[in-house]
A protein has these predicted regions:
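NAD(P)-dependent dehydrogenase/reductase Rossmann-like domain
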Residues: 1-151
Length: 151
């Protein structure tokens, strides 16, 4: 079965076939239109939360411990960086020079001067070379590119 055919009915069997454990629980914290997905492996765990109110497009509202507000369009770039002046400008310049159009840029931080997270929704695909160049920028700790199918 292909990953693109993932749905609520077959999620458990697909996860188990790949050696993953899947558990479901309900919480009023996210409301009736919210969902949270937690992934763990080895010593790491990440949780992503979002909302999809009826009749409205979905939005990501949390990535890890960071509160964000961004639509999962074609491609999402997720960066972790130091919260210092110039990071957003350097990222925007690099993406613009690479021909990548920014649809939304959401920067979140836990504390001034500490770790920050950028959730950047862009038009079209982003190649591995752009990701590698983002990692070369000062104060960028990690760069992840997520391509959404059918977004």
């Amino acid at each position: 079965m292909e990953v693109e055919r993932l749905n609520l009915i077959n999620a458990r069997s697909l996860a188990e076939a790949r050696g993953m454990e899947l558990s479901c629980s309900e919480s009023r914290e996210l409301g009736t239109s919210g969902v949270q997905v937690s992934l763990s492996g080895g010593m790491q765990e990440i949780a992503v939360a979002g909302v999809a109110p009826e009749g409205s497009p979905g939005r990501l509202t949390r990535i890890g411990g960071f509160h964000v507000d961004v639509a999962p369009r074609d491609t999402l770039i997720i960066l972790t960086n130091n919260d210092v002046p110039g990071v957003i400008g350097r990222v925007g310049t690099l993406l613009g020079d690479a021909g990548v159009n920014i649809a939304e840029y959401h920067q979140a931080r836990l504390a001034q001067g500490g770790e920050a997270l950028a959730a950047i929704s862009v038009d079209g695909m982003v190649g591995a070379g752009v990701r590698e160049n983002l990692l070369k920028l000062p104060d960028i700790s990690s760069a992840t590119v997520v391509h959404f199918r059918g977004a």
